[in-house]
Amino acid sequence: MRMENIYEYIARLQSEGKWQESFGVIRAGLKDNYNDYELYFALGEYYLKDNIDKAYLCYENALFYCDNKDDRAYISGVMSEISSCGIKVKPLSIVIVSYNSKDVMKACIKSIRINNISSSYEIVVVDNASTDGVTEWLESQNDITLIKNQDNKGFGAACNQGIKASSPDYDIFLLNNDTVVSPNAIFWMRMGLYENDRVGATSCMSNNGGFQNITEVFDSVSEYIYYATKNNIPEYYPYENKVWLAGFAVIIKRDVLDQIGLLDLRYGKG
């Protein structure tokens, strides 16, 4: 007699209404294999009963990791069906301020591209009159909207320029250029953003995020990335409510931004 595989086991648990048990199995599976698209699809099934937006994001992440043509078509069909029911999820406009530091910027952009499905975001970079060649590199990238300032406008003003240049129906992700986006980091930030209607913005943990620091210390970027693959997984209580967030990586709902307006330039630091 053939043994049940993990996906069949999860499906059986869900069909029997054992949702929390299925969540635990999905969590354990993603801790071992962070890019298993079938587990993200199963996670979407878990959320579908309570939160269609989070379910959609899970299916989108499943599509990103899926390398099977037939399964990709099936996942896309599920996403289209959910979209027709009315979802609030918006793509991201990733706004980055640039001032020199070409290699740092290249690493940041690369980390966005390799860890996120291209249909889920756009990149807007505002360059504050750099002189080290980063402007020319940015100009050569066909997936970046570039705003070139003739002088250094400062961080806040440049962020506002980027927000104004973003697609009007996209959520805004303000991201420092010295960040490296780890696997599933943006996915889980967006999951938090659509936890409920009361959430207006989300941020994340970092090795250098002030009060949002992780406690572990490693010697290389690759070690931090590995740490992220083991920790950017489903959790029962993954989010903390905050009245303010560290500014190195913040996603703001478009609806909220439309209500509160652009960054207040009286406050100089991000």
Stretches found by the model and what they are:
Residues 60, 64-114:
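N-proximal low-complexity "stem/linker" segments adjacent to membrane-targeting elements
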Residues 111, 127-135, 151:
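A conserved acidic beta->alpha catalytic loop
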Residues 120-129, 147-149:
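Short beta-strand/loop segment that forms part of the nucleotide-sugar
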Residues 149-166:
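Glycine-rich, basic loop-to-helix element that forms the pyrophosphate-binding segment
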Residues 169-180:
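Short beta-strand-to-loop acidic/aromatic patch adjacent to the donor-nucleotide binding site
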Residues 180-218:
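Conserved donor NDP-sugar-binding/catalytic core segment of glycosyltransferases
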Residues 208, 227-255:
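A recurrent flexible, glycine/aromatic-enriched loop bordering the glycosyltransferase active site
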